[in-house]
């Protein structure tokens, strides 16, 4: 099965055919660095990191560009409020973004350009647009004329006349049409500026991505990505100005990830349901957040809630427990030539093919992880039955590891991950870990003395506080429910 991707431009899944055989050029809109990143940013960046990883796994040489928007109204407003230069704000939050992305296990893109380092390229594109009649200067500003580009709104499928008639749209004094957008903004007091043919000023948001993508990927490239919220106006305007300037198609495949909802409501600062990545990682392991974000298809909306994060943590823990069980069984004394379980052998051997088929169907990570859980269930059954051929278990481990390497998951040492998760859960309990261990010792003594009533009381007391005791021949361990 060849890779098929959903193209927002056509509204259908299409066979993925690159401009150059074996090479992919991909541009993804980065963040505006004026504040801490929220979980919507986490989703977009994890999704395109997954796509980046899978394309390389599939044998492509990938040039991946993700920018920083480091000059913008929001950055300037924050800088003025704090009384510092705008670049102090942008550099601070670039560093915060980089820390967040490293925690989430993202591979570095090929290039991470900053808008402020590409002003000359932006001015060159604007000059071409003015010369071709697609843009006009107006008292220090430069605007793109949407009526001059007859394919405007082809990405979002909106209607220009209906939008013009909308009550919320007002014609500015300088604009010829209410939907015309700024390519260059004349300087204002208290704002950074650069020299240009139209006077001192700074670029508009949309021209930044066009100029940077053209510099690193050329006038036409394979994939342009971002969140669904960028389809209009940002990506629509990028297409208009880029294709008007170059007379060529801009990007062939437009890929957009779905929204993040908070407890079934749209994430919004005004609703008070706005969570930064930093806040989430104080309560949850970074790999749990990444696993949660990849557990749904990238185009589907995803509901962020404590319950869903806890379920993701439990699912990831099941996988790590299976890996730990495999490692223990493979390392155990013996010949390793036990019974060969046909179901386990088939699922282990078949996982790479099933994984590829799922991912080739528009990067369906939800289906891919479903196949991993199928294998994990077979592993757990076989481990419980005992007397299994270690080579088959090792092949199951290798198959899961290969999937994890592509998705950026299952990279921790299993025992260490389980302990890390246990420690996080224990930190939220109303009882200290040392007290749990003391009660387990008391329970062991009670059982040895055949005081089963006291042993049961201790078990029930711990259960009421969310602690589950696990008795085995090796002793008693505990976990958080």
Swiss-Prot record:
Enzyme class, broadest EC rank: ligase
Reactions it catalyzes: tRNA(Cys) + L-cysteine + ATP = L-cysteinyl-tRNA(Cys) + AMP + diphosphate
Keyword ATP-binding carried by entry: yes
Keyword set, alphabetical order: Aminoacyl-tRNA synthetase, ATP-binding, Cytoplasm, Ligase, Metal-binding, Nucleotide-binding, Protein biosynthesis, Zinc
Annotated residues for binding of ATP: 269
Cofactor binding note: Binds 1 zinc ion per subunit.
Motif ('HIGH' region): 31-41
Subcellular location: Cytoplasm
EC number: 6.1.1.16
Motif ('KMSKS' region): 266-270
Residues binding Zn(2+): 29, 209, 234, 238
GO MF terms held by the record: ATP binding; cysteine-tRNA ligase activity; zinc ion binding
The keyword ATP-binding appears for this protein: yes
Co-factor requirement: Zn(2+)
N-terminal signal peptide: none
BP GO annotations: cysteinyl-tRNA aminoacylation
Gene Ontology cellular-component terms listed: cytoplasm; cytosol
InterPro entries: Cys-tRNA-ligase, Cys-tRNA-synt_Ia_DALR, Cys-tRNA/MSH_ligase, CysS_C, Rossmann-like_a/b/a_fold, tRNA-synt_1_cat_dom, tRNAsynth_Ia_anticodon-bd
HAMAP family linked: Cys_tRNA_synth
Quaternary state and interactors: Monomer.
Protein family (similarity comment): Belongs to the class-I aminoacyl-tRNA synthetase family.
Protein name as it appears in the record: Cysteine--tRNA ligase
């Amino acid at each position: 099965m060849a890779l098929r991707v959903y193209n927002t431009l056509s509204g259908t899944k299409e066979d993925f055919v690159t401009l150059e055989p074996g090479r992919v050029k991909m541009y993804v809109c980065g963040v505006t660095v004026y504040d801490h990143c929220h979980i919507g940013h986490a989703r977009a960046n994890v999704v395109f990191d997954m796509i980046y990883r899978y394309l390389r796994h599939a044998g492509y040489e990938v040039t991946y560009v993700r920018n920083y928007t480091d000059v913008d109204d929001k950055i300037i407003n924050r800088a003025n409020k704090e009384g510092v230069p705008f670049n102090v704000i942008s550099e601070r939050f670039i560093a915060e973004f980089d820390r967040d992305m490293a925690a989430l296990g993202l591979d570095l893109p090929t290039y991470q350009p900053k808008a402020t380092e590409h002003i000359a390229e932006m001015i060159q594109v604007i000059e071409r647009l003015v010369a071709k009649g697609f843009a006009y200067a107006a008292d220090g500003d430069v605007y793109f004329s949407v009526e001059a580009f007859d394919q405007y709104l082809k990405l979002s499928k909106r209607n220009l006349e209906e939008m013009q008639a909308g009550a919320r749209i007002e014609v500015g004094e300088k604009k010829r049409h209410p939907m015309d957008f700024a390519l260059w903004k004349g300087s204002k007091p208290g704002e950074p500026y650069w020299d240009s043919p139209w006077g001192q000023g700074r670029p508009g948001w949309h021209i930044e991505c066009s100029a940077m993508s053209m510099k690193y990927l050329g006038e036409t490239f394979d994939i342009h990505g971002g969140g669904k919220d960028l389809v209009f106006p940002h990506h629509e305007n990028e297409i208009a100005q880029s294709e008007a300037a170059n007379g060529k198609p801009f990007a062939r495949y437009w890929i957009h990830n779905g929204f993040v909802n908070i407890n079934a409501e749209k994430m919004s600062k005004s609703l008070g349901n706005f969570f930064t990545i930093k806040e989430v990682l104080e309560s949850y392991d970074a790999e749990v957040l990444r696993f949660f974000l990849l557990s749904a298809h990238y185009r589907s909306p995803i509901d962020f809630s404590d319950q869903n994060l806890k379920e993701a943590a439990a699912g990831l823990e099941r996988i790590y427990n299976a890996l730990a069980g495999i490692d223990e069984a493979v390392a155990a004394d013996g010949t390793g030539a036990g019974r060969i379980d046909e179901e386990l052998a088939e699922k282990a051997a078949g996982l790479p093919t099933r994984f590829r088929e799922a991912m080739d169907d528009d990067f369906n990570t939800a289906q891919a992880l479903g196949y991993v859980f199928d294998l994990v269930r077979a592993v757990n059954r076989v481990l419980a039955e005992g007397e299994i051929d270690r080579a088959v278990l090792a092949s199951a481990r290798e198959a899961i590891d290969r999937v994890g390497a592509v998705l950026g998951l299952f990279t921790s040492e299993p025992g260490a991950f389980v302990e890390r998760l246990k420690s996080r859960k224990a930190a939220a309990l109303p009882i200290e870990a040392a007290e749990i261990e003391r009660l387990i010792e008391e329970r062991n003594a009670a059982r040895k003395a055949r005081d089963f009533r006291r042993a049961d009381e201790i078990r029930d007391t711990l259960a009421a506080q969310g602690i589950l005791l696990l008795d085995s021949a090796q002793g008693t361990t505990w976990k958080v429910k």
